[in-house]
């Protein structure tokens, strides 16, 4: 699975390891990218401060949208790995209880060991062995 499919497609399954690695990477990477783009914006020295401010807001919105979309896709894929509907993402809108439930289900519990209705196991379990 390519990194764009991993981060921006809600289809398929991912294992816990990949879920945590991507969550940590994007939690660090998106703010770093945001501040790097803002620094670049400051170095360009646009003529109007209003234009600079508008571009800064647009950069912030794009970074935020990227973060949220990738978060949704990663969590939906973890629900799929647990053989549950991606609509369970909506449980995050229940304060505290929904957050804890999602953390335990998606971040701590193992996925379905073999193929399920959302695809084959990301660990390769339950598949035919192929010699060549």
Description of each model-found segment:
Residues 50:
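Binding-site signature for planar aromatic cofactors or substrates
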């Amino acid at each position: 699975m390519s990194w764009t499919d991993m981060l921006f497609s809600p289809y398929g399954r991912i294992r816990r390891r990949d879920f945590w690695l991507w969550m940590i990477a994007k939690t660090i990477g998106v703010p770093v990218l945001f501040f790097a783009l803002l620094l670049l914006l400051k170095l360009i020295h646009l003529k109007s401060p209003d234009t600079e401010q508008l571009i800064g807001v647009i950069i912030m919105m794009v970074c935020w949208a990227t973060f949220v979309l990738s978060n949704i896709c990663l969590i939906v894929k973890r629900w799929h790995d647990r053989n549950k509907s991606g609509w369970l993402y909506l449980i995050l809108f229940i304060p505290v209880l929904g957050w804890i439930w999602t953390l335990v289900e998606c971040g701590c519990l193992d996925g379905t060991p073999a193929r399920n209705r959302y695809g084959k196991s990301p660990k390769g379990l339950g598949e035919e062995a192929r010699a060549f």
